[in-house]
Amino acid sequence: MQLKRSFFIMAFAISALTIQVPIFAADAELPVVFTEDFEKGSDSWEILDPNTWKLSERQGNSTLEITKRKSEYQPEVRSPRHIALIKDVEVEDFELTFKVRSTKDTGNHRDCCVFFAWQDKTHFYYSHLGAKPDPHSGQIMIVKDAPRKALTTNETRTPWTDKWHHVKVTRTASTGEIVVYFDDMEQPHMQVSDMTFKRGRIGIGSFDDLNEFDDIVLRGK
């Protein structure tokens, strides 16, 4: 009887520890450091070519939109031309979510870009959500004093339509892990690990296409 009682107490203790694990994980969720719905304008953004972006309103909802494919911003090395960076925020670990609508079908390289660990105009990562992947489209890229270079060999198409889509990008600086999601928030669209850059700024945009953005939430530290 004593042996059975001791076993029961031990099993209960182990069970209690197991139950507490998800609670600990929830507590570890990164804090929200920035949100944007553009209802009060775009003053929180540094736009590298303001003449190709505008605030738009449809049915009472405000968005930020790229309106011209050609940009006056000409980067020193081959890399995206439409870039809007969040002001006064730098993160190392982060989770970025937002809605995006591609407003022009430009074919295989129809895209949206997400910028992160931005140091300056020639040092940063970006995710290129191109419709058809190749070495210059549909990959996680690095810019480091040279034209953009793919870190991934992704072969999964980005299924653009004219409707709104959901994007999530996560980064764990301690391991270098970068994970990108498109519509399906459980199954990664592409992922890689790289330790070149850690803390930096976050941005949205496109290589040279037209997009509309809304409902941006950045969690990070």
Annotate each PLM feature.
Residues M190-D215:
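Flexible glycan-contacting loops in extracellular carbohydrate-active proteins
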Residues H82-V89, T152-P159, I202-G203:
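Beta-strand-rich interaction surfaces with strong enrichment in secreted/lumenal proteins
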Residues Q74-V143:
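Secretory/extracellular carbohydrate-interaction modules
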Residues D145-H166:
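Short, aromatic/His-centered strand-loop micro-motif at the edge of beta-sheets
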Residues S42-E72:
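Extracellular glycan-recognition surfaces and repeat-rich motifs
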Residues F38, F98, D162-A173, I178-V180:
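Short tryptophan-centered beta-strand motifs in secreted/extracellular beta-sheet-rich domains
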Residues I9-P22:
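Bacterial N-terminal signal peptides
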Residues A26-P50:
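Extracellular carbohydrate-recognition regions
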